[in-house]
Amino acid sequence: MRETYRRTLQQRIAKRRGLALNTKPNQSISKAVIEFIRSTVVRPIHMLVTEPIVGFVCLLTSFQFGLLYIFVVASPWTFETTYGFSLGAQGLTFSGFIVGTMFSYAAIIAGDRFLYQRKLHQFEHEHQAPGTATEFPPEHRLYNAMLGSLILPSGLFMFAWTAEYAIYWVVPIVAQAITIFGSIQIYVPVSMYMVDTYGPLYGASAAGASSLSRYTLSAVSLLFTLQMFKSLGTGWATSLLGFCALTMAPIPWVFYRWGPMLRARSKYEREL
């Protein structure tokens, strides 16, 4: 892949032309360690708590990641207790996730090809005149996420109330496929939206905040998933997740509508 980071490109150009590189003076080890901690730990946490875009994107991505781990634990238990599936048959129930994942990435590619790229070419055509240099709004990344915000709760509620002995076992597997489809439709676009918003430098810190939050929630979710499903039953335990997804469904739509205002108020200037 071609290098796209501006500072690296500038350094390469300067080196080819024999120009002096604008490098920082040698730092002591202690200052280098402090700078490393600041950029890899302090900044991501600061962005997580002070930047609305980072905070809500981390909330969305953490929920999607945690949802995957929850189903890894809850799905085998559900099909064992409801349908009497053996250990080997329980593994086959994840075929819904495989199918849903395949269709989800196909939809993301289609959304990029027929929506995002079309909007990008239209924007470049309209702003190609001299003096009209303007950044392409990253909100156009959110089309698939807005679709996924409607599909995810539907899949969760469908799984919640079709995972019953009287209903054929294929139906909840289809519900799982719909759930993972909607989840990936949210996860990938909002992550790309956040990186596009902050650029390569601060986008890396924002991605670090996302990693911190989603792995923390994923680890915690494993501690209560089985107990929650045993106490509430598959119907109400999954419905609880559905209500959480329904509560977070407006977030991509809010970003699409008010994202420019939030970006304008950001304390972190985007680096190209």
Predicted ranges, named:
Residues 51, 61-62, 209:
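Short acidic/histidine-centered micro-motifs embedded in hydrophobic/aromatic stretches
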